Amino acid sequence: MVWFKHAAWRIGVIYEIVPKNQQTANSEADDDQYYFRIAQLGHAVLNLPNVVKESGDMRPFLTFSVPASQNDFTGQSFASINWQNLVTQRRQNSDQATVRLDLQTLGLEASKMAARAINNSFSVFNRLDDPQPDLGYNVHSYGGLFFGAELINLNDPVRVKPPNYADSSRDSDGKKKTAVMLVKRILVDASNRLFFRGPVYLLIRQPLATQTAGEHQDTLLAEEISFRNSLLSETDAQSGRWTWFQLESAAAERVEKEAYGRFYLSHKLLKAINPAEYQQSVAARQLKEPTAWVNSRVENGAGAADLGCQRNRRVAIGASVVEGVGIQLPESIREEGET
């Protein structure tokens, strides 16, 4: 699920990724070498057209906050509203210009509510083993999941709640320090509760980095550190270089609400969403905490019910897109809801 530029910014679900040429199809290419087919969020009865976008026209869902719903929809869920009745009522107006405007407004409200609902759900794929006793309950282990707007695989870095003793750490702008888990296990118990396990790292500056630092364990974390340290002057570097300090071992665990979403490279994210601020940061040789430019999953789902575990991604998306849209997943992904 992403924001995409379409006169104004709108929310949609990528349902197919198409290479621009045959060479791209046979290689690991950057995002700008693909077209992205997107189903606009709203409701199926609105029959919103699908669109095709390039990577430069999209932003991660968690980079923008979802605007509040109009008063008429406050306190209601996407699934509880009779969207067909609302569409029928608006089409009874004899002024077609008013009808078009009213349906556009209704579609916008539906998209906001649908986005929060999808954000507050998850669905798992690629089961790895049979149920096993673990901490007193049976659990299944998985290779990945759709976590709200995002796809997360094992070994991906995910922003998480720091341990209590480090949770008050903040940068000079008042933003919380960034804690990241390298996800080694994705677990769902018999009550469909979700858990992540893996080592947790905190982004800090210190004189020396140990071999257990996060940049030695993950290429994305290494790139974050490399760019930040490249901004340091020789004098600044003497007082400490950036590193991912290990806070917790691979046995560390976070429940669903303590996982905030994927970790995004600060410089690439900032360059995409605010090029002017990116240039200013490079010139000043200072880069804010990654939390400055991306929300948590909990923040973007505020006000909507927690839908929890869904059978598969298409079920989670439900009636929020036009009928007939199928999600084209890589062959490597096998969802729990498949028969």
Summary of predicted features, one role per range:
Residues 1-339:
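Eukaryotic chromatin- and chromosome-associated nuclear factors
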